[in-house]
A protein has these predicted regions:
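Short helix-coil-helix linker/hinge
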Residues: 86-96
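Helix-turn-helix DNA-binding motif, specifically the short coil turn and the N-cap/start of the second
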Residues: 119
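Short helix-to-turn junction characteristic of helix-turn-helix DNA-binding domains
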Residues: 102-106
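N-terminal interaction/assembly modules
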Residues: 1-87, 136-146
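Short, well-structured alpha-helical interface segments that form or flank functional binding sites
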Residues: 5, 15, 76, 94, ...
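Long, charged/polar, surface-exposed segments that mediate recognition or autoinhibition
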Residues: 99
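Short alpha-helical "recognition helix" segments of helix-turn-helix
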Residues: 111-116
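DNA major-groove recognition helices of helix-turn-helix
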Residues: 123-137
């Protein structure tokens, strides 16, 4: 895994949390519509009839549990990426700021440039230096683990 992939793990986890939140919201809307339809039919329900409201409720519980796990994973990844970025602060402060704004705050490049008060060419150079420092850390970690 290269430095850019490593740093973007938190972004991907955040996107997954967002998707799961939307899916859970849709399930809540569906359960409301299913509940209102089943109340309107006016027919007696036998024991063999499927229970759509209960099925949706089970899906909601499962989706909520999946969302909880995804949030925990995203927070753990954020902390790991944050610590890795902060570890290069003493070596290159600007690179640390650029990586922090881009990969922790998930800002687009134009906002990163505004936040650190540098032009895009300077920010890009600092970003590459930061990626090189992160890559070195990842390789050192991998070497020490094996």
């Amino acid at each position: 895994m290269n430095a850019k992939e490593y740093l973007r793990q938190y972004e991907y986890a955040t996107r997954r949390v967002y998707r799961l939140e939307k899916e859970l919201e849709e399930e809540y809307l569906l359960i409301d519509s299913v509940r209102s339809l089943s109340d309107l039919d006016g027919l007696p329900h036998g024991t063999n009839v499927s229970r759509p409201v209960e099925d949706r409720a089970v899906r909601i519980v499962d989706k909520a549990a999946e969302l909880y796990e995804a949030r925990i994973e995203a927070l753990e990844l954020r902390q790991e990426v944050f610590e890795t970025i902060m570890s290069i602060d003493k070596k290159d402060g600007l690179a640390c700021d650029v990586l922090y704004e881009r990969y922790i705050h998930l800002k687009p490049w134009n906002k990163v440039c505004e936040t650190v008060c540098y032009t895009w060419p300077t920010v890009r150079i600092a970003w590459h230096r930061g990626l090189d420092l992160i890559e070195l850390q990842i390789n050192t970690r991998t070497y020490n683990e094996s």
